[in-house]
């Protein structure tokens, strides 16, 4: 077993060796290096064929038509294209958008930008377990609502939203429905033939493909229109200009092909490992599971350890690559906005750790993790005056702290 142990698969994944090998064939003079937009020679045709194959592989995993897949530089760009693209195109119809407070920053900050441009955004607070209350969502829908954007699986706590029902609610009212599926694609079954989802964002690097490539699913029937955010040569049916990075696209396609083949068995394996981890630490005093294990993705476990400072815990767990919050925001010392939105106090939010498991996680690593966490929590609490007071029965919330 190699240390440190990587348990941050929700931040990024290593590229699968099968994917890397495939990508190598599309870089050098000996490989297929052409520009897929070059129509006049075989270098271009071969590159275009490789892109078509990858587009099909992605569409097959999610039950879409390959013509509905638009390549972007990642899920952040896909979120931006979806939300700004719809807002700009449909603004004559209305200027109201609904999303939730626990979305990824790529959705929240895009909505904030639209607010500055005169759109109105409703941010729904989820229930205590992170799930959106559908009655609240329905109550928020108005005549001028043009877009609802709700993620499939939350990147911090792993809860799964009921996108099937939300899709029905939106479709019956003629509201466009966007789903950020970055954390769910290749992990949970997605069938866009059945789901009433109009736009869906995907990433390559969260599912053992390369970084710097993603895609946006744009429904054709009923047709969803977008205003392009990137202008140029009119690539990707005018929705996203820019020369296609063939090696990245091939890598993403291969990663999605592998995910389709291995998903069912792999998710059972990860669910077993996640449960093993939780069962190994849930009898520690003052430990709280964030999210909902029943309605949660099989690969994410977010836990708060009361009376232990999150940063010091991460230092103590230096043999584990874990995070507090998401990778995009964990550099700030602010407690996770996702956990705050669940109504959690600052102390508990500060003491949270996200364990996210993946393809190369082993049972041996999980057992090592359990032992290390138990030891570290014990040691840090021995040093903690707050823990001592708690054990003596002092109500810590009633203490008047001196302000210096």
UniProtKB/Swiss-Prot annotation:
Entry protein name: Cysteine desulfurase IscS
Record-linked PROSITE patterns: AA_TRANSFER_CLASS_5
This protein's record includes keyword Amino-acid biosynthesis: no
Organism field: Pectobacterium carotovorum subsp. carotovorum (strain PC1)
Cofactor: pyridoxal 5'-phosphate
GO BP annotations, alphabetical order: [2Fe-2S] cluster assembly
Pathway it works in: Cofactor biosynthesis; iron-sulfur cluster biosynthesis
UniProt EC number: 2.8.1.7
């Amino acid at each position: 077993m190699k240390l440190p142990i990587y348990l941050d698969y929700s931040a990024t994944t290593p590229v699968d060796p099968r994917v890397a090998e495939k990508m190598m064939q599309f870089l050098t003079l000996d490989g297929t290096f052409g520009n897929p937009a070059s129509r006049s020679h075989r270098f271009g045709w071969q590159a275009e064929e490789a892109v078509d194959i990858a587009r099909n592989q992605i569409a097959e995993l999610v039950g879409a038509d390959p013509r509905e897949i638009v390549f972007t530089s990642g899920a952040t760009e896909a979120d931006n294209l979806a939300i700004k693209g719809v807002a700009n195109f449909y603004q004559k119809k209305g200027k109201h958008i609904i999303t939730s407070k626990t979305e990824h920053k790529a959705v929240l900050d895009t909505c904030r930008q639209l607010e500055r441009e005169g759109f109105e955004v409703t941010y729904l607070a989820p229930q205590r377990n992170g799930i959106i209350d559908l009655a609240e969502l329905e109550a928020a829908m108005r005549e001028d609502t043009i877009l609802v954007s709700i993620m499939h699986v939350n990147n911090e706590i792993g809860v799964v939203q009921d996108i099937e029902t939300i899709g029905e609610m939106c479709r019956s009212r003629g509201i466009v429905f966007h789903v950020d599926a970055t954390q769910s694609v290749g992990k949970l079954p997605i069938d866009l033939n059945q789901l009433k989802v109009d736009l869906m964002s995907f990433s390559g690097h969260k599912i053992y493909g390369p970084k710097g490539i993603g895609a946006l699913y744009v429904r054709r029937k009923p047709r969803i229109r977008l205003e392009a955010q990137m202008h140029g040569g009119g690539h990707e049916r005018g929705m996203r200009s820019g020369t296609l990075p063939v090696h990245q696209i091939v890598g993403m396609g291969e990663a999605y092909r592998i995910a389709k083949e291995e998903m069912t068995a792999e998710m059972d394996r990860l669910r077993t490992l996640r449960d093993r981890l939780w069962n190994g630490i849930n009898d520690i005093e003052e430990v709280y599971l964030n999210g909902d294990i029943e309605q949660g993705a099989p690969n994410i476990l977010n836990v708060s350890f009361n009376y232990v400072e999150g940063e010091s815990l991460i230092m103590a767990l230096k043999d584990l690559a874990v995070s507090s919050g998401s990778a995009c925001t964990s550099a700030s010392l602010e407690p996770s906005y996702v956990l705050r939105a669940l109504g959690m106090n600052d102390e508990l939010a500060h003491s949270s750790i996200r364990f996210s498991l993946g393809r190369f996680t082993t049972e041996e690593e999980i057992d090592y993790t359990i032992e290390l966490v138990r030891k570290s929590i014990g040691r840090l609490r021995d040093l903690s005056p707050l823990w001592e007071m708690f054990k003596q029965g002092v109500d810590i919330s009633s203490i008047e702290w001196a302000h210096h």
